[in-house]
Amino acid sequence: MINVESPLNLETTLGSLQFSHGSVQNIGMSISMIIGCELGDKSFIVTALLAYQYGRASVFFGSYLALFFMTSFAVLVGRAAPFLFPKSITHILGGTLFLIFGVKMLKESKEVRESQQSLENEFDKVEKIIVNEEDMKKTLELGLPASNRSSSTLKDKFFKVFSMSCFKNLFSKKFSRAFIKAFALIFVSELGDRSQIATIVMSAKEKVLDVFIGVNIGHMLCTMVAVIVGRYISNKIEMYKVLFFGGIVFMIFGILYIFQGF
């Protein structure tokens, strides 16, 4: 007996396939956006250095948990945007932001290429900052005067907040120290970062769940690369190429969003 689907069932099936295709596309765009933002970014470098110093597992979970919280916040903000602005305005504003970020990254790529900076140079700079913070912390704990001591920075405040005993009771001393430090540094460095703003923009335009899944997958991939081979690839990848790739990705997204706004 031949079973002929009714037009209604056929329409429903096609709608489901279209939804699935759209979701895969949104997730793929979110992943590529995060890779373009985070690969070689300061958060990537901090994660790689901390993993080299303390151990991979604790740093991975600390870094990724911070990124997960920041992503959740960005997605919620983006979800609220369509209720505040018309859809066309949201698309145009979001596309404009993507274009601005894209142009800025391409400009940075050109400057880095002309100055012959490498990703390894960025690792060295961030490593010095981390070492200086450790030295300052030890000096303050010993009660010694610090000539270059300034008012408490935002990172110091966050580090004190997340260094509470409840965290220390959950993990061993070494794991707790690495976990808390990775969480605090990544959390602060991601505030107002390109990836956070881009997540807000994409959440305002695309399906929130798709963006949430894609962004978290992207962050997970970048964090895994950072903790496993981050320091090793620092002298294998040219910084200007990373920035150029990110700039192109942002430019493409910006043009697509502005086009859809009209």
From Swiss-Prot:
Keywords on record: Endoplasmic reticulum, Membrane, Transmembrane, Transmembrane helix
GO molecular function, one term: manganese:proton antiporter activity
Coiled coil: none
Superkingdom of origin organism: Eukaryota
Disulfide pairings: none
Primary localization: endoplasmic reticulum
GO biological process, one term: Golgi calcium ion homeostasis
Parts of the chain that traverse the membrane: 31-51, 57-77, 83-103, 208-228, 242-262
Endoplasmic reticulum among keywords: yes
Protein name (Swiss-Prot/TrEMBL): GDT1-like protein C186.05c
Taxonomic lineage: Eukaryota, Fungi, Dikarya, Ascomycota, Taphrinomycotina
